[in-house]
Regions:
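Extended, low-polarity segments enriched in aliphatic/aromatic residues
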Residues: 1-138
């Protein structure tokens, strides 16, 4: 395709800590089992350097899975948060979404290691102060 849009759902993930835009790219990996058993955090950052970047990342955080991800065990794992995040910068959008998630469940940025690893690889930035962020409350 000429362009593609990455549309993940914000949720907790046992191994990666979070499934957002970067982790969503695991859907294009043939052998996900290998990635999940060989430094998953680094693999998530690495895949962002190999694939054609999405023209837009749209994170659906309307209902988010706060525990027992990626599948969940019950409705109690899900919370109505009414959030939506969009950016061309995959690291920035995942950073913002993680900060949002942290309001629902303790999940500091440092625990989602693939964010810093991707920033080191120059995939994007975790420094949200560098960006022109527009917040809309509905």
């Amino acid at each position: 395709s000429d362009v593609w849009i990455n549309v993940p759902i914000l949720k907790n993930h046992g191994g990666a800590k979070m499934t957002i835009s970067m982790k969503n790219l695991m859907g294009i990996v043939w052998d996900r089992g290998f990635f999940h058993s060989h430094d998953l955090q680094q693999c998530i950052a690495d895949i962002c350097t190999m694939s054609k970047p999405a023209v837009l990342n749209v994170v659906d955080a309307y209902r988010l899975m706060k525990t027992n991800g990626p599948r969940g065990k019950s409705e109690a794992d899900v919370v109505l948060a009414k959030g939506l995040f969009m950016s061309q910068d995959i690291v920035a959008v995942d950073t913002a979404a993680t900060n949002f998630f942290n309001q629902v469940r303790d999940m500091p940025l440092e625990s989602v290691e693939h964010l810093a690893k991707a920033q080191e690889l120059k995939v994007g930035t975790m420094n949200l102060n560098q960006l022109n962020i527009k917040r809309i409350k509905m």
